[in-house]
Structure formats: C-alpha cells, structure tokens
Amino acid sequence: PSRLLLQPSPQRADPRCWPRGFWSEPQSLCYVFGTGTKVTVL
C-alpha cells in the first residue's frame, strides 16, 4: 500500500498537498490520492 505521511506542514511554506501524502494542519486537512485528486478540508 502507499505510504501515508502524517506530519505538520512547514510553517515557512504555505499549506500544500504532496503526492501520496497526508498533511494535518490546525485549520485545514489536505488529502492527496495516488490518482492525483486533491481534497482540501478547511
């Protein structure tokens, strides 16, 4: 299965979605699927 990363996004950079990555933010969650579909939940 794809590796799912759960890490705080860099404060110096804006919230972004990374391929096959999972970013958890205080006010937003960014889900990235292998299909390239990006879903941002604010």
UniProtKB/Swiss-Prot annotation:
It is found in: Secreted; Cell membrane. GO terms for cellular component: extracellular region; immunoglobulin complex; plasma membrane. Disulfide bonds: none annotated. It comes from the Eukaryota. One of its GO terms (biological process) is adaptive immune response. Immunoglobulins are composed of two identical heavy chains and two identical light chains; disulfide-linked. This is Immunoglobulin lambda joining 1. The gene is IGLJ1.
